Amino acid sequence: MIKFEDKTVFFTSQPIVFNFEVGDVIETPELVIVRLNIPADNQTRQNVFALKKDGKFVWQVESSLKKYPEINVELPYENMTLLEDNKLIVSDFFGRTFDVNVTNGKLLNFKVTR
């Protein structure tokens, strides 16, 4: 099990330090998916990353505003869940949920849940 504290995720080979506090970590057989807590006054939006089990970077989540310009405002993700079928779901403050391809971080679709 991968451990994390503050801005650091502890891999067997080395600790990885991010610019922001780690909010969630989800492990799959191949990847460690990390969601960062972004302060309200910061413009960072793509706050979900995947790393290999040795800590090597794999992907950063695709920009929702570039993929879906109709959403008008891009926010950092506040929650993430990995479903049994290996589907990653992330959601933002506006109640929008996005399906993320776990292999490459691309957004597959979105819906509003509020």
Give a label for each model feature:
Residues M1-R114:
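Secretory-pathway ectodomains
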